[in-house]
Amino acid sequence: MSDYKSTLNLPETGFPMRGDLAKREPGMLARWTDDDLYGIIRAAKKGKKTFILHDGPPYANGSIHIGHSVNKILKDIIVKSKGLSGFDSPYVPGWDCHGLPIELKVEQEFGKPGEKFTAAEFRAKCREYAATQVDGQRKDFIRLGVLGDWSHPYLTMDFKTEANIIRALGRIIKNGHLHKGAKPVHWCVDCRSALAEAEVEYYDKTSPSIDVAFRAVDQDAVKAKFGLPGVSGPVSLVIWTTTPWTLPANRAISLAPDFDYALVQIDGQAVILAKDLVESVMQRIGAAEYTILGTVKGAELELLRFTHPFMGFDVPAILGDHVTLDAGTGAVHTAPGHGPDDYVIGQKYGLETANPVGPDGTYLPGTYPTLDGVNVFKANDIVIELLKEKGALLHVEKMQHSYPCCWRHKTPIIFRATPQWFVSMDKEGLRQQSLKEIKGVQWIPDWGQARIESMVANRPDWCISRQRTWGVPMSLFVHKETQELLPIERTLAAMEEVAKRVEVDGIQAWWDLDPKEILGEDADQYEKVPDTLDVWFDSGSTSYSVVDARPEFAGHAADMYLEGSDQHRGWFMSSLMISVAMKGKAPYRQVLTHGFTVDGQGRKMSKSIGNTVSPQDVMNKLGADILRLWVASTDYTGEMAVSDEILKRAADSYRRIRNTARFLLANLNGFNPATDMVKPEEMVVLDRWAVGCAKTAQQEILKAYEAYDFHEVVQRLMRFCSVEMGSFYLDIIKDRQYTAKADSVARRSCQTALYHIAEALVRWMAPIMSFTADEIWGYLPGEREKYVFTGEWYDGLFGLEENEEFNDAFWDDVRYIKDQVNKELENQKANGIKSNLEAKVTLKYADDANGTIKKLKLLGEEVRFIFITSQFVISEQAGGIDDENIQYNAGNTTVQAVVTRAEGDKCPRCWHYTTDVGKVAEHADICGRCVSNIAGNGEQRKFA
């Protein structure tokens, strides 16, 4: 017999070598949908302990970008890993559907409400637009392999959710947190609406920087404070500002109580400013000669009055902790209608909250003759000219600084005092209770705690009212004359009645409502509040409107919120505020934040730079599993770099993992775990070591999943596939797997190990490379559920005992020695020994302090299979080994590998060189071992 191929157990599997993910994944998705995989998982996990990851709703506008993909994939990895950990982890995706961006899109296409159609028709078009956006994004999220209740997501525009948002506000009102006030809020003149903190972005802007003198009303009183009654010339207090347009609203000048303020003589007049800033101010205003006449603490100047340069009234000097020495003069222009710090101190001193600016950003009539009707950003030059005319301008220059802008229009915004509704941070202790609750939450990474604590500690009251058309109505009634809210009990009853109607007909029910239907005879005295709720209230109240309401959550609170790091001031904040205001507790147990995506050079993604990466393109070219593997392998706690090159590296890693899985499957051909499994105690020692290796890897992988360290999962998975399996175990077993008798213990032991490893590996992969894990699952032998996602981590792993002779420590030493032997074998290729099986290795040793060599000797003939050489001899060197040739030194054991050409002839069946080829007449061209494996009882293997 010259062709022995038919006698070999060659690997065979239908599992393709190439993933072809972009082509195969859509077919798998179709099967998942047809089978209702999400429903199957829910049924399988019913009754288990719950883990609820509550989805922060993306905005229903535009196609998904790479940041969306990162977010949804991270969530999916957690949900799937929790399922494998024995939890029932339902995932209900959501969308944020109200608000300005959708209004702008509809306006661009159809015009503003009231122009070509009614507000009701406009809302209907907004609802229709949002629904189409949801459908588009949903398809892309599903294509990512994210499992969830995509047929029944939550939308903030669902009638029931809209009704529950109104009920959430009612609970907050009941708990005493709502108040009305004319406070300065971020105002976009293009939106003509207040903006939330999270809707404000900062860009560089050039503004005029001016120093302005406010002359003292009672000159003698001011001079007396400094103990200098004889000062010549008028005395003024100097302020500095970069917003000259706010000067008409000035109502005070703020000083720091503990700073030293100097009276400085210049050019026939005296000016007051912070002593530490005198030198820089004098340089700025060009005063070459000046004299500091005296100093006093800021507190000494409190309530002295100074004349406004052009408004015709005088203003007091007041004391505030917000005054700094970072820039300016140490005297702060204070306009309570145009800044939160100014407002707070204005309230303390009973100042007027003047608001001379209309919603369109122009001065209201009666402000000042040359300013009435002028846009505030065009008014700076007019104000500067006024100051020059009045002799009050000491200096003007241009400066570039960071300025707040609208997130949609990218145009500068203003602080503007308008009648708005606020959730009070302090009236009922919301700030303190929130800070207390923050400490009970696990923040991942842990720096998130300090970040949100700082934000909560310093944030102003939350302005929740908006002057928009497309949003959830506040559903409040106020008295026509006093503007007071309807008495509390009646307010709550009215809100519940409105909520019931909204639950049936949506938010339009509020605008269609005749107040008489609810208020009866009192309707003539009250009017409906036209404001809608801030969209951050919509999404922030979902712990109540969605989590508490959905039956699959069974009344459990959310375990985790997971979003980008910008959401500390966004969704994490609004959710915390609302939950604490409603229930007195945080809405989440854990909060995980991920960084933003950047390109390979660390630059922010930008269409103008052209460095964006489209998730749709990646899925169409490489497949979703490559995108998922990139997300998992990147440390999400910092910026997440992505580029074609980085994705190519992810694809390379994927191939290594896939090749390992394919090797396992191909060598499980013909293996039936029900009949062919070998008991652990009867297995070859090396096979038990391999299963133990998987057990150790699984412990570390599960620990990493539990800690949400997914890049650690991928690294450990790669080490297992490439190092422990690929470069050691899988190479060694090829000879035994291919050449031993098909049903011998030697081969079945090996297959048993491969089976256990494959069962574990496919589960480790499932949360990350979900499509590939599903594909592998379909090729694994043995009875099993239809999907890997319905089960749990594999519990059939075992390993070597520490007290065994050939324990893990021994195999660690063997692997090290093998690495050194392989280096010498590589060196000998230049001398004509082209393959390891052409070699004979003599392992020389001088001592054996840790007993490794003694154990190697006990392996007998089988030691050569570990080193994949035809012959392997161990030789003691009584005279010691030359230090230069030491290749292994651990525990005082030193060895040297000497490689020579193997003796004998090559066996065409097993490719080993041996001296007994042709010794059996019936099989004259093969070795004795192969004869035994073909025609005899087969070789016995105990160790390798």
UniProtKB/Swiss-Prot annotation:
- Catalytic activity line of the entry: tRNA(Ile) + L-isoleucine + ATP = L-isoleucyl-tRNA(Ile) + AMP + diphosphate
Listed A to Z, the keywords are:
Aminoacyl-tRNA synthetase, ATP-binding, Cytoplasm, Ligase, Metal-binding, Nucleotide-binding, Protein biosynthesis, Zinc
Entry's Gene Ontology molecular function annotations? aminoacyl-tRNA deacylase activity; ATP binding; isoleucine-tRNA ligase activity; tRNA binding; zinc ion binding
Residue interval(s) of motif 'HIGH' region? 58-68
Listed InterPro entries: aa-tRNA-synth_I_CS, aa-tRNA-synth_Ia, Anticodon_Ile_BEm, Ile-tRNA-ligase, Ile-tRNA-ligase_type1, Ile-tRNA_ligase, M/V/L/I-tRNA-synth_anticd-bd, Rossmann-like_a/b/a_fold
Quaternary organization: Monomer.
Please report the name of this protein according to its UniProt entry. Answer: Isoleucine--tRNA ligase
Q: Which organism is it from?
A: Salmonella typhimurium (strain LT2 / SGSC1412 / ATCC 700720)
Lineage per the UniProt record:
Bacteria, Pseudomonadati, Pseudomonadota, Gammaproteobacteria, Enterobacterales
Q: What's the encoding gene here?
A: ileS
